[in-house]
């Protein structure tokens, strides 16, 4: 009997130790996930530093300061407005207009008016997810990464509007583009409940198609109204080449953008082992398909290099060589 009691005590002790080890492992995994997404945010800020330098380098001297201020203000206003309403739109609209906003969540249960209002408004009960909360290690870093996606979309359109738009007008456009237009597209095609995904099987791992399509068509719509840069065309209709004032600045911006791309795509991976994870043993895309950082390393390095080489072979022009990389 004494032996049985001792054995039972040992089993209980081992059970307690195992529970403690599991708890510690979960804490470690949670802290790693938080740090992982946190580090993607400053990497993505480098994208904006890169776009700022890239655009300023391609601007004529008289408009350099205006170009830089335009980028800084767009960055700041997009993040603030994404906090106020952009994040809410992302969670509220995935199934709209296929279903009504009030008809409930999608098949994953992470969308719809009720769900968005519970987690994505910066006031009321949902403010616990939109501010400091010692028990929440995910909402803040997820929001930060998504906010940088929104700001990146605005930065892409900014380059097409060099020397064509006033600062206040551009800030308004950046808010509409980054905190609404792109967010709606992301809700439809870059969300597991999005109707483009559930109805048509649309997949866009890094949101590259959504970001560039929305930013590109948005910029095109503005350009159709604004017209060409002052001094681009002569009276006889012939075109003038408007060269940037500082190519080294543009090249530096390009390299910063490449660094930022790694952070952008890192943030697109759903890490394993958490309550919000797809799997317990491997990373996944936002759609639940398997993905690894190794795959991203191959793709980003080869894509950037291939773009530079291809543009150099066909143009021998420094600007188009850099644009080929982008």
Residue ranges and their predicted role:
Residues 1-5:
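N-terminal amphipathic/basic-hydrophobic helices that include classical n-h-c signal peptides
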Residues 6-326:
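Hydrophobic alpha-helical transmembrane bundles of multi-pass membrane proteins
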């Amino acid at each position: 009997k004494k032996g049985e009691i001792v054995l039972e005590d040992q089993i209980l002790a081992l059970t307690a130790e195992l529970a403690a080890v599991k708890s510690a492992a979960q804490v470690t995994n949670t802290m790693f996930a938080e740090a992982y997404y946190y580090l993607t945010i400053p990497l993505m800020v480098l994208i904006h530093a890169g776009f700022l330098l890239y655009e300023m380098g391609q601007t004529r001297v008289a408009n350099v300061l205006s170009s830089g201020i335009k980028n800084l203000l767009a960055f700041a206003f997009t993040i603030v407005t994404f906090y106020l309403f952009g994040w809410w739109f992302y969670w509220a609209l995935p199934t709209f207009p296929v279903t009504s906003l009030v008809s409930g969540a999608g098949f994953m249960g992470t969308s719809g008016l009720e769900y968005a209002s519970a987690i994505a408004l910066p006031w009321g009960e949902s403010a616990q997810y939109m501010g400091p909360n010692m028990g929440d290690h995910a909402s803040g870093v997820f929001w930060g990464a998504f906010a940088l996606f929104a700001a990146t979309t605005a930065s892409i359109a900014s380059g097409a509007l060099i020397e064509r738009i006033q600062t206040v007008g551009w800030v308004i456009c950046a808010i509409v583009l980054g905190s609404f237009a792109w967010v709606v597209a992301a809700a439809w095609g870059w969300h597991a409940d999005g109707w483009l995904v559930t109805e048509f099987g649309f997949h866009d791992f890094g949101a590259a198609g959504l970001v560039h399509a929305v930013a590109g068509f948005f910029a095109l719509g503005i350009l159709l109204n604004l017209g060409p840069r002052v001094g681009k065309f002569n009276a006889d209709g012939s075109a003038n080449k408007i060269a940037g004032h500082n190519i080294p600045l543009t090249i530096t911006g390009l390299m910063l953008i490449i660094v930022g791309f790694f952070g952008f795509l890192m943030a697109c991976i759903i890490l394993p082992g958490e309550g919000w994870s797809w799997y317990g043993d491997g990373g996944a895309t936002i759609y639940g398909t398997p993905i690894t950082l190794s795959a991203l390393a191959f793709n980003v390095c080869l894509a950037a290099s291939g773009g530079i080489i291809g543009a150099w072979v066909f143009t021998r022009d420094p600007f188009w060589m850099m644009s080929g990389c982008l």
